[in-house]
């Protein structure tokens, strides 16, 4: 009786943990027809927790384990409401990164959280301390073990029973508990996930003849498209890459309450030598980390695994490495801890030598980030530099007012989430204007190549297929062609375009298209992914 009650309570807590994931609208309705097999999976995961609790004999230890399980679930509930994802394993130890939750913590907590927490902990206390018939629970325990083992056999033997997931990300116990909503390993439950990870934790493999043929074919194609650069072709003094969090093209052009939401970015788009508000997002399950990977390396993220976790120590022909070979100092400024999403390790992989973060400033968001970026730019004023800065204030959620907002938007032409998103976009735009003013004031605008690009789309009022993100290339460095481009482009085009602007002649040129080279052609989506997986799985550039 005790064990079955414990199992039931754990199941209910898991169901509650994933409740917000469903109501966010991230689940696909067609998957709900699999409710029975997915409830089976929830029960199976809860069974694991129950077995752990009842393998321990000490009552206080049982209660402690239950408390840890409750705490982890509630942390994920609150974190999910803010970031639309569960807590990633890389967040552990990066407590300061949770400062971003500070301003909205009370807006994120619901009354039902307290009710569920009290019910769960109260039920566990009653089961552990009040039901004292040891012979009874021992008997149930040993009956329960073969049942769980039978579940395992049935579940693994017939994995098709789990053709999709009711909660998509229900088994986050074993490692990459992130927004891996399309990874099939998460669709088969806890033990299947652990079993598969024993064999796929290391995704690296040896190069094959087929790999070599694919890469040689790509290199041959790139050679046929190549432009010959003069040995004395001019280079910009600075390359400044502003990687904008969740900035959508609609925000750049939006007028709300009679005013431009992002006047500085809109002006840059209008005055830029090159601008395109029709860039398609190509990120996968890693979202922001994938966007950074695409821009820095010219490849897509891995087709299955979370790239920054599975391929952290790969070698790449990163933009940092390319710029260093041209004599540039390299640095990145970020708003999170250095180890979040393995940022420190990924910077090394991209060839970026110095990493600065503003996490000590807590909730100053992009104000502190831009201050730090200006300081870093000043410190590199007398040398060529490649500086990347990654913004944060426009991150989800768009469910409550932004404490640092400069405007309270009321325009009834937009849904509430858009208005809340505009608050954040307007705040970021103000501080972007400060950065642009500082570049002009310090004389660093005149011969700089400045790239502003969004990491991915966002917003529940739109979808990936129709959402577009901006690419703006500006600064005083003269581009070969000046135009406001309306054709559809892709994130993978940026890497090869930058190689062309920096007159880099190398065999690896990414999977995209050079936007300034009419002879250049991008690969098909299928071929892009194939080449990207080869580069990642074989660690193609490892020496």
Identify the function of each model-found stretch.
Residues 233-235, 464-468:
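Short, flexible loop/turn motifs enriched in small residues
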Residues 263, 321, 371, 375, ...:
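Feature representing long, continuous alpha-helical segments
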Residues 427-466, 495-502:
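Metal-dependent active-site segment of extracytoplasmic phospho-/sulfohydrolases and closely related
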Residues 316, 338-341, 478-543:
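Membrane-interface soluble catalytic domains
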Residues 146-241, 246-415, 423, 511-515:
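Active-site-proximal alpha/beta segments of enzymes that process anionic O-linked groups
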Residues 415-431:
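Active-site-proximal segments of metal-dependent phosphoesterases and phosphodiesterases across multiple
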Residues 1-191, 195:
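Transmembrane and membrane-interface helices of multi-pass
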């Amino acid at each position: 009786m005790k064990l079955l009650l414990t199992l039931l309570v754990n199941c209910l807590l898991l169901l509650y943990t994933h409740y917000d994931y469903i109501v966010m609208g991230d689940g696909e309705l067609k998957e709900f027809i699999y409710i029975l097999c997915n409830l089976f999976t929830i029960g199976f995961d809860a069974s694991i927790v129950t077995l752990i609790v009842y393998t321990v004999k000490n009552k206080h230890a049982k209660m402690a384990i239950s408390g840890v399980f409750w705490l982890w679930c509630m942390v994920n509930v609150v974190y999910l409401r803010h970031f639309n994802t569960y807590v990633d394993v890389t967040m552990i130890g990066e407590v300061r990164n949770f400062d971003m939750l500070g301003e909205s913590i009370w807006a994120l907590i619901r009354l039902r959280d307290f009710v569920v927490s009290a019910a769960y902990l109260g039920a566990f206390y009653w089961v552990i301390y009040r039901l004292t018939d040891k012979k009874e629970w021992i008997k149930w325990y040993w009956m329960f073990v073969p049942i769980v083992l039978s579940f395992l056999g049935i579940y693994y033997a017939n994995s098709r029973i789990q053709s999709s997931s009711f909660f998509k990300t229900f088994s986050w116990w074993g490692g990459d508990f992130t927004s891996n909503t399309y990874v099939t390993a998460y669709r088969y439950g806890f033990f299947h996930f652990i079993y598969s990870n024993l064999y796929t934790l290391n995704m690296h493999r040896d190069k094959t003849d087929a790999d070599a043929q694919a890469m040689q074919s790509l290199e041959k194609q790139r050679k046929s498209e190549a432009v010959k650069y003069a040995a004395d072709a001019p280079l910009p003094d600075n390359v400044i890459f502003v990687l904008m969090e969740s900035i959508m093209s609609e925000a750049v052009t939006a007028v709300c309450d009679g005013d431009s939401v992002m006047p500085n970015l809109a002006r840059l788009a209008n005055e830029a030598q090159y601008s395109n508000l029709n860039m398609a997002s190509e990120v996968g399950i890693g979202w922001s980390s994938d966007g950074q990977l695409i821009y820095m390396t010219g490849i897509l993220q891995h087709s299955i695994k979370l790239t920054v976790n599975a391929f952290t120590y790969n070698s790449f022909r990163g933009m940092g490495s390319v710029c260093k070979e041209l004599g540039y100092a390299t640095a990145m400024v970020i708003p999170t801890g250095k180890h979040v999403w393995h940022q420190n390790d990924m910077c090394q992989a991209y060839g970026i030598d110095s990493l600065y973060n503003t996490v000590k400033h807590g909730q100053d968001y992009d104000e502190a980030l831009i201050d730090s970026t200006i300081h870093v730019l000043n410190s590199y004023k007398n040398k060529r530099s490649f500086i990347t800065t990654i913004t944060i204030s426009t991150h989800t959620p768009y469910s409550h007012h932004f404490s640092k907002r400069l405007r309270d938007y009321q325009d009834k032409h937009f849904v509430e989430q858009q208005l809340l998103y505009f608050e954040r976009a307007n705040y970021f735009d103000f501080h972007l204007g400060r950065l642009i003013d500082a570049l002009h004031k310090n004389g660093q605008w005149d011969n700089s190549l400045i790239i502003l690009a969004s990491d991915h789309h966002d917003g529940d009022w739109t979808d990936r297929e129709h959402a577009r993100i901006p690419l703006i290339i500006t600064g005083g460095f003269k581009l070969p062609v000046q135009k406001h481009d309306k054709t559809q482009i892709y994130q993978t085009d940026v890497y090869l375009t930058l190689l062309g602007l920096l007159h880099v002649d190398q065999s690896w040129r990414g999977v995209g298209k050079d936007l300034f080279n009419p002879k250049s052609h991008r690969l098909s989506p299928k071929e892009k992914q194939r080449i990207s997986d080869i580069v990642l799985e074989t660690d193609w550039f490892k020496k």
